[in-house]
Amino acid sequence: MQPPTSTDQLQTITDGLNLPPFERRMTLITLSEILHDPVRAMQLLADVAYQVRPHSLAEDSKAVPPPVKVNAANLEQVAAGITDFTVCLLNLNESRSMADKQAFVQELVLSDSANMRVLLSAILKDLAASRETIYVSKFKLPPVIPADYMVDPQIQTLLSQLREAQSRFTEALNQNRDVQKDQILQKMERLATDKTTFLTRRDKLFDRVKQAKALSVPKEAVRLASRRRVALSEIEELKTQINSQNEIRRAALNAAKAVVNSARGTPANILEASEAENKRLKQEIINLTAEITEKESLAHLIQSEPGQEAIELMENELETLRTDLVKYREMVSTVGSPDEEDNEQEKMSFLNQQITKIKTQRAQLENRLTNARRESAEVDAEVAKRCSSTDMASLMKDIDDMDSIPMLLFKNLLSKGRALKPLHKKAMDEQQLLRKENAIVSRTKDILAAIPNLSAEAPDELTDAGGLRPIGGGKQRVLGSIGGVGLNAKNLMEAKAVLAELDATLQQKKRDLAPRVSELAALKRQCAQLEADTESENQRARTLEVSREGSVYKLRLSVRALELEIDNLKTQAIVTDKKAELLRLELEQADNVREFDRLKREITSENNACKTQMMEIRAKQEELKCNLPNRMAQNKLFKSLVSILEFRKQAALERQEDHAAEMRMDKIRITN
């Protein structure tokens, strides 16, 4: 056989490390990196060797130390300790010397060691077999003794005793393996026999149950046929009642449509009423959805409904199966007949429950119809009251002029208007101030334009009703008083100087007021934009209100349609309940519950007995494993005692034969 290559060894190591109890998720690249690092490679070997370390069976219950942590300081020490009990996996027939083991250890601690790959692959190839081999080798392999001590006679004596003990251990081990193999084979044979017995009993029980079902079908078929006819008649009556209720619902729906179309009121009242109606409809839809889910869960029972043809066939076969029915009754009497009175009571209680349920549903439908009629009457009365107390033309005009803005949108616009109110007030104040100053400037220009005419016509006298007075908070001067004093040349020069100063002040004032004028224009544009936005939002709110009313109307129509559909589903659910009742009665009569329970208890008790026997066998096996060395020693001792007793018996027989021969010789001598 060709030895494995390094690639095969690496693949074996990788596969072994990916299996329990390691589960390292190792790859060839990761393993190669680990093997190139001596410390990591030795740590991996220590973890693997920890799973196959030699320990006696008595040490299983004791706490064992965890695997060692490898570092550069204890590298050779750990390698030597692992090599002592794992080297047996490499060559079982060769006893290695101390020098060979030292060379093996020195090569084991190298980077990418071949011995490391060989040792890991040998352990991980079969972990259970490696563990057993190492355990057995602890007792079978001879110890490594230096050659200097081999000449000692005491060492030779101890070695001979060790070889004898190892031979006894090998013999006991082989006997134990034979015993375990025999016990396993016996256990397998016993389990196979038990399985065959149980399968035979199960088949017999199944045959009896099938026979019981076949014999109970004809009698039950007649009863089912009669009950089915009664149930179908009840279903037809229920359909008639539900159709009449649907007609009443349609009338209520038409009345509700008329109320919705004729309703008038403020937008707030309409919105509040619509929200309340929407909440009520949502809750009703949730309740109806739950009822639909409950009724749909019973739809699968319709699939197993017996057809009319099958029932008629059962009725025709009734006469031919009467003899079999007599046999079935005799068989049932041996097992135990079912209590007919209990069955009748159960059927009556079930029918009473179904009748109560149908009455409850009918009462609920009547209550809902009464509530719908009462609400319709209230709405009609409210509409009539409003129409009688209010002029419809003026009411429609007020509704058209009213801003029907939703509450959230109205609050948003109100907050924006409140934020812009201080800016608007400031702009209006500044606009008023500018108007006053503009009037003053216009008046001053008129006065200044009149001054040259006055100086030309009356250079000595100039009268005017106006005058100079400071304005604008003391920041500028204007003409306040021109009159009462004659204008001469000197006064004219002073007036020109004053006018020049006034002109400069006016120009400076215009430059100062230019930003404020532009800001005022921007504020005006912003106010105009805000008014346009408000108008557009109002228009949008009106559109949303109209669309919302249409959506509410459509939602009501869809809810009414769903109610009609739910009524149909209720009808189908009632039909399903009746059919389910028929099927349940058929199943109750067909199944022999008592026989099934008794057989189930018997099978369960037998399974428990088998489990108890298996547990006892396992306990005996564990006890045998623990007491194997002592028993083997006792076996040897008993064999020695038996051989001694046989030798003594044989010696006694030989002495008796010698004594008898001597007696015969004495008789012969006496006779002669």
Curated annotation (Swiss-Prot):
Positions of region (CH (calponin-homology)-like region): 7-139
Gene source species: Giardia intestinalis (strain ATCC 50803 / WB clone C6)
Alphabetical GO biological process terms: intraciliary anterograde transport; intraciliary transport; intraciliary transport involved in cilium assembly
Description of its domains: The CH (calponin-homology)-like region shows high similarity to a CH (calponin-homology) domain and mediates binding to the globular domain of tubulin.
Protein name: Intraflagellar transport protein 81
GO MF, any single term: tubulin binding
Coiled coil: 155-182, 235-382, 492-572
Range of residues in the leader sequence: none
Record's keyword terms, sorted: Cell projection, Cilium, Cilium biogenesis/degradation, Coiled coil, Cytoplasm, Cytoskeleton, Flagellum
Subcellular location per the Swiss-Prot or TrEMBL entry: Cell projection, Cilium, Flagellum; Cytoplasm, Cytoskeleton, Flagellum axoneme; Cytoplasm, Cytoskeleton, Flagellum basal body
GO cellular component, one term: ciliary basal body
InterPro entries, per the entry: IFT81, IFT81_CH, IFT81_N_sf
Function: Component of the intraflagellar transport complex B (IFT-B) involved in flagellar assembly.
Annotated family: Belongs to the IFT81 family.
